Amino acid sequence: MIKNTKKSQKNKILTLEDVSISYGTFEAVRNVFCNFKSGDITSLIGPSGCGKSTVLRALNRMNDLIPNCSLRGTVLFDGTNIYDKRVDPVEVRRRIGMVFQQPNPFPKSIYENIAFGARINGFVGDMDELVESSLRKAAVWSECKDKLNDSGYSLSGGQQQRLCIARTIAIEPEIILMDEPCSALDPISTLKIEETMHELKKNYTIIIVTHNMQQALRVSDMTAFFNAVEYEEGDGGKVGYLAEFDSTKKIFSSPKEKTTQEYISGKFG
């Protein structure tokens, strides 16, 4: 079981040690070493097929749900290998929450979208207070407070995504993973999500996959650039790898790798 050190979150770190991920015989990502610091927003960027979403899903064992997906190496959270057989993956996903690319509210009321997960995770406090505080943290309370009994589907796309963020917050995670959370949203909704992320950073560590370079520059403290190279066997397949990891300021102003510069300047993608 992962030890609970919520009160000392600033000391937390999520570490990947020589992580390689495969789908059957296809190796998607190879030899990733990376540290995610507590309290940071970290962006994972890179061209399609470089494995950044695969790596993101590995951080809370969502890849376990994909047939024939396997991981070599170690993923440490609070010093515990989350892939140890003694670790409950459901507990991992509670402590490290996920917001997906497409808004996916439950087919329930707005209120129950928040309350349902908290209830099955054993919450015994004031549910009304939890619902309100979660919706406030996700910056959607003012738009929902008068229609909590309406379906989550009645909200706009941007509101639905913030509802999903609130739903994640309600089960009290310590890290929030976001897989291109704004890709299906309009610019105004995207701005609201980004503003929400800046507020959430005060209490949560956030790791986000994005194809939007300006978004990475606006929201993140650290940026990891993933790229892909052809297999040594020369069969035309490619494997992803972590090409560069540094502060967002350095990645976008003075990257060490030529490929990083070429990617952020739009020469490939």
UniProtKB/Swiss-Prot annotation:
Its main location: membrane. GO terms for molecular function: ATP binding; ATP hydrolysis activity; ATPase-coupled phosphate ion transmembrane transporter activity. It catalyses: phosphate(out) + ATP + H2O = ADP + 2 phosphate(in) + H(+). Pfam families: ABC_tran. The keyword Translocase applies. The keyword Glycoprotein does not apply. It is found in: Cell inner membrane. One of its GO terms (cellular component) is plasma membrane. ATP binds at residues 46-53. Its EC number is 7.3.2.1. Keywords: ATP-binding, Cell inner membrane, Cell membrane, Membrane, Nucleotide-binding, Phosphate transport, Translocase, Transport. InterPro entries: AAA+_ATPase, ABC_transporter-like_ATP-bd, ABC_transporter-like_CS, P-loop_NTPase, PstB-like. It is a peripheral membrane protein. One of its GO terms (biological process) is phosphate ion transmembrane transport. Residues 14-253 form the ABC transporter domain. The complex is composed of two ATP-binding proteins (PstB), two transmembrane proteins (PstC and PstA) and a solute-binding protein (PstS). Part of the ABC transporter complex PstSACB involved in phosphate import. Responsible for energy coupling to the transport system. This is Phosphate import ATP-binding protein PstB. It comes from Prochlorococcus marinus subsp. pastoris (strain CCMP1986 / NIES-2087 / MED4). The lineage of its organism: Bacteria, Bacillati, Cyanobacteriota, Cyanophyceae, Synechococcales. The gene is pstB.
